[in-house]
């Protein structure tokens, strides 16, 4: 099994998602994504996390999200995504 570790920093927002998606291609194979450096996220940021999770699942692997701040976790709960995304 291939696992990867990655870290995202700054804001996960609409303006940055295309750039971040390109930078996170390797994370689509499963592993741990560290969000401890993320200051803020919007719904586009959550969509990025969902896409990375989807890519992992498509390969039969798992993506675990570590270090997410409370704002990100609450936003995921609000949209019911805490049942899909795996927060450590």
Model-flagged regions — what are they?
Residues 1-44, 51-88:
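STAS-like cytosolic regulatory interaction modules
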């Amino acid at each position: 099994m291939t696992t990867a570790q990655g870290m995202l920093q700054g804001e996960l927002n609409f303006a940055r998602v295309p750039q971040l998606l390109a930078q996170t291609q390797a994370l689509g194979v499963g592993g741990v994504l560290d969000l401890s450096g993320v200051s803020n996220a919007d719904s586009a940021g959550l969509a990025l996390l969902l896409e990375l999770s989807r890519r992992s699942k498509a390969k039969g692997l798992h993506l675990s999200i570590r270090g997410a701040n409370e704002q990100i976790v609450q936003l995921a709960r609000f949209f019911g995504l805490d049942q899909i995304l795996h927060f450590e």
